[in-house]
Amino acid sequence: AEIENNRLGINFRFQNSFAPGWLFQASGQTRAFWKDDYEYKANGNNFDAESRINELFVQRSFDQHSIKFGRQTVVWGETVGNSVLDVINHFEFRDFTIIDIEDARLNQWMVVWDYFGEESNWSSFINLYPEFNPAGVRGSPFFFEPTFNFTDYQRDGEVLVEVGTQWKKSFDLSDISFMAAYLYDNQMRFEDPLSGFGDAIGKKNDFILLGFSANRAIGRLLLNFDLAFSHDVLADSFNFPGTSALASPLNLKKDRIGTSFGFEWAIDNEQSVSLGIQAQQLIDEREGLLPGQQLVYEGVYGSWLVRYANNLLN
């Protein structure tokens, strides 16, 4: 696979306060893929384009309350782009390049209620139709040729719901938040079809998330910190048919502790630099493993992200 190198993108947003206390908002994006881009090659060396609607919601505000219904995202955590708490929205893994994280998050059908109190705020959500990470796009760095086709989760009339709430308090130069949620792993676990041919079988997993986040402003510097405890996450959710082996455990649930921290530094009114470091570890990671079995991630694992931004708009 190759990094994309020849594409054109357009993002758009529409917002209309059509009545007192009412707001309609929609956003979307269009991508065109030209010669030498991997999407162009994956399309048989032909021009290709795609479009999608991101946000599409109606908001009602009254007194100290705000209620939004429609396709939207809910973002938790202070560490921009690399937070252990930013797991509510499913993602489209496509490119290695640095993009706005909003381009990777996929919106879902939600009801979001916000309460703005005098000393603290509450925010709660209900995801009415939880979705899962789509399979990698053919030709992209995250794509591999699977033994069996990956399909969407077969709900068969099953009702899936995600819920969560957050309490936030602001001080003179800092904020703190506590949060709790019942979620489904964004990444499904896939199993071989029982017949040995056809489509892979997607398996879901639900878990509980408890979190804490804080930030502190010091002049032009903003320090941030996130902490997450996840109960009953899958130890290995990236075992795909044809890539896993007997040495890999199946359907093994674990508790996980994770933290992310970093800073954002405003160089001036147009330029900024940010750093985010993420680290996670499974609790009692060897418990439940058979002799010879091992996890894809053992010990402490994580990632880091550095960003430089220059806003050229006046």
Question: For the regions a protein language model found, what residue spans apply to each?
Answer:
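Transmembrane beta-strands of outer-membrane beta-barrel proteins
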Residues: 20, 24-26, 67, 122-124, ...
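Residues that define the transmembrane beta-barrel architecture of outer-membrane proteins
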Residues: 2-8, 49-54, 105-109, 159-163, ...
